[in-house]
């Protein structure tokens, strides 16, 4: 399957995320805690927890922090009781936006999210207004120059759903959300190391933005991502330089 290049846009957004590393540990700890609460403390039996722990290790989170977060989720240690909630809406030029939160106060969270939408030119919508535009999946990006045929064979053998060749030569391997870690491990065992990858909500159709619209949209996304209760922000917008 062929696709246009997402490489530059992914690098662009990853750079912004890396600039906010001060909040990354807090968000990862919350995700580990909730994952353990929902599916138990054994990462081998809990795909969501395994993803969260793998991500924490990739960010060099100390082992004790990870173990304590799991124990808070399973009730072995006292902790805050977080609730999952999702808010949907529209950004600049009607671009779809979905905001996933973990909070101990939904009243506060919905007010904060609504304020960010309103302040930066978006509109908060009703439940389900844009969720159908996104697919829950995992992806791994391999830099230009990788052996595409060998990667495709290894990826499909490992359980990947699709392999996408982009215009710039980069290759994306698409997986189911709960097969991501297994596919990643299988490819690494065969010498294929991805540049980046994650489980995400991916827009089925993208909204290309440039100029002033791109600037305004980025401000909205930044405002949402900066909220303490927000875990992830997904959008159909592709931000031009």
From Swiss-Prot:
GO terms for molecular function: DNA binding. GO terms for cellular component: cytosol. It comes from the Bacteria. Keywords: Cytoplasm, DNA-binding, Transcription, Transcription regulation. Belongs to the TACO1 family. GO terms for biological process: regulation of DNA-templated transcription. The keyword DNA damage does not apply. The keyword DNA-binding applies. NCBIfam families: PRK00110.1 (NF001030), PRK12378.1 (NF009044), YebC/PmpR family DNA-binding transcriptional regulator (TIGR01033). InterPro entries: Integrase-like_N, TACO1_YebC-like_2nd/3rd_dom, TACO1_YebC_N, Transcrip_reg_TACO1-like, Transcrip_reg_TACO1-like_dom3, YebC-like. This is Probable transcriptional regulatory protein CV_3123. Signal peptide: none annotated. Its main location: cytoplasm. It is found in: Cytoplasm.
